[in-house]
Each structure stands twice: as C-alpha cells, then as structure tokens.
C-alpha cells in the first residue's frame, strides 16, 4: 500500500476532528475530536518518517502520545469539575466555572 493513502487518511481524520471541534458543544465530544486530531498528526508524522527512511517522525509521534496522555488527565478533570458545578458538559458552561 502506498504511503500516500496514509497521508490522505490522516488529512481526512484531521478534518473530521476539526469539524467536530468547531461544531459540537458537548465538552466530551470536543475532547474526543481533539484527540482524533492528535492521532491524525501522529499518523502523518509516522508516514513522513517512513517515506524519508528515518525514525525522527516516530520519536516525535511517541512524544505527542505522551503529551496527549497528560492532556487526557487534565482535560477530563476539567470536564468533571464543570459537570459537578453545572450538571452539564456543555462548553458554554466553561466560563461559569469560576463561580
């Protein structure tokens, strides 16, 4: 299979994630779309790494996954805090978290 197909898949996944971030109001769905965008970037990094024949893209994808794991912890903690105070997971309620 040609590496270009992986780049096309990466572009489609990134676009779906970006559309989800822009159009959805539920914080959990937005969070999942951001993770989809990160995974699409990882797929592109690994594909470019394979095309060039070096491991730099794979190492960078590993570090992106480490940062994404930390993001999951912080993001879910914020979503739970919003849900506990407002009984809603809407991103519109995020500005009300300080009260």
Swiss-Prot record:
Membrane topology recorded in Swiss-Prot or TrEMBL: Multi-pass membrane protein
Signal peptide segment: none
Top-level lineage group: Bacteria
GO BP term (any one): ATP synthesis coupled electron transport
Family the entry assigns: Belongs to the complex I subunit 4L family.
Record note on quaternary structure: NDH-1 is composed of 14 different subunits. Subunits NuoA, H, J, K, L, M, N constitute the membrane sector of the complex.
Protein's recorded name: NADH-quinone oxidoreductase subunit K
